[in-house]
């Protein structure tokens, strides 16, 4: 099984950008922790970050046939991108949305996610550990898919 982790705009600035909101952990450190969890679970993982909406849409589309699930932090595109929403819907892969901060506690324009309706769930406001929680959630989804496939073989 393979997880694609997609990081949206400005997440490459973690550790420097608004540490009072996002903390001091760098994106590379978050990815190292996720890689460790994936290694322990025997799961492949790939990381992608872009500040450009079209590149994120392209990466989501490339997941067809190459990934089994997506963990995405669409960052500011959460509130504006119908294109990312539609791409996730089109690929029909289990997707978990992650946010380091809690958008509901921030500006009004951050309170609505256009992405949430096409995801298996959201993990928000737990800081960088939210990515670990998303990994646990995705691994559980993989186990459920495996169990369903096994049960269907027995029919």
From Swiss-Prot:
One of its GO biological process terms is:
quinate catabolic process
Reactions performed catalytically: 3-dehydroquinate = 3-dehydroshikimate + H2O
Tell me the superkingdom of the source: Bacteria
State which Enzyme Commission number(s) the record gives: 4.2.1.10
Keywords linked to the UniProt accession: Amino-acid biosynthesis, Aromatic amino acid biosynthesis, Lyase
Residue sites binding substrate per the record: 73, 79, 86, 100-101, 110
> Where do the coiled-coil regions begin and end?
none
Q: Which InterPro entries match?
A: DHquinase_II, DHquinase_II_CS, DHquinase_II_sf
Q: In chain numbering, where does the site feature Transition state stabilizer fall?
A: 17
Q: Where are the catalytic residues? A: 22, 99
Q: Name one GO molecular function term.
A: 3-dehydroquinate dehydratase activity
Fetch the Pfam families from UniProt: DHquinase_II (PF01220)
Class in the EC hierarchy, top level: lyase
Pathway where it operates = Metabolic intermediate biosynthesis; chorismate biosynthesis; chorismate from D-erythrose 4-phosphate and phosphoenolpyruvate: step 3/7
CDD domains to which the protein is assigned, alphabetical: DHQase_II
Q: Which HAMAP family match?
A: AroQ (MF_00169)
Q: What is the stated purpose of this protein? A: Catalyzes a trans-dehydration via an enolate intermediate.
Q: How does it assemble?
A: Homododecamer.
The record's listing under PANTHER family reads: CATABOLIC 3-DEHYDROQUINASE (PTHR21272:SF3)
Which family does the record assign?
A: Belongs to the type-II 3-dehydroquinase family.
Protein name, per record = 3-dehydroquinate dehydratase
Per the UniProt entry, what species is this protein from, by scientific name?
A: Campylobacter hominis (strain ATCC BAA-381 / DSM 21671 / CCUG 45161 / LMG 19568 / NCTC 13146 / CH001A)
| The gene coding this protein | aroQ
